[in-house]
Amino acid sequence: MTRYHNILTFALLLAGATGCSKFLEVDNIGKSSTESFFAELSGLESALDGLYSETFNYYDDYMNYADLASDLVDLTPNASELQTDIFEFQALPEDNAGYPRLLWKAAYNVVTNANNILHFGPGLKESYPDDAKKIDRILGEAYFIRALMFLELSKVYSQNYTYTDDASHMGIPTPTQPLSFNATVARPTLKATYTQILEDLGNARKLLAEGDPRTGGKEVYYVSDRACRALLARVYLYMGNYE
């Protein structure tokens, strides 16, 4: 009798194990993949909000450096180790865990978000034909912000454009597509970096001109064609192109 019960128990366990294999193959509940997030227009709009937020975070870190490295502020006892290093001029270029890494990471967070918008956004026009102009405007703003980050990164991590006669010195990576976590991107010349910046700003101007303009008094807080022209003027100034 005992042997019979043991065999029956084993058979039930075996049946349960084989029967559960299909049950366990379920989608993650409460989690959204990148593809599913961008399947709706609302996801694209939320991503743009996040893009502006990440840009703000970058400049929050960027502006801190000038203040902390000057005598404009007094360091408080509860200052972070990172802030103390900047204040005491201990933030070194080779310090991969300090401020040089912080700015690099913050800027490329912005670039990554912009690349996702620019990769998935155009496909939504087929699903939302009535909102095509809104999508164009969102894409235009993303192009501008990506160009802005490439310019800021080149200012921090490269020499100025005229450092060599043909701008053949090292620029910064300019990824234009979503990347895997472990992807590596080569650093092009600064001339190639600026070529990408100018291309992004050209695309931004075209899409912003074709897209629905922002209204309601809040447009001054967002990217516009005027902002594109202003940034283009700054880029040409850095290039020494005054024509």
Regions found by a protein language model. Name each.
Residues 20-69:
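Membrane-proximal, proline-rich intrinsically disordered regions
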Residues 1-30:
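Bacterial Sec-dependent N-terminal signal peptides
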Residues 83-157, 188, 206-209:
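Conserved, well-structured interaction surfaces
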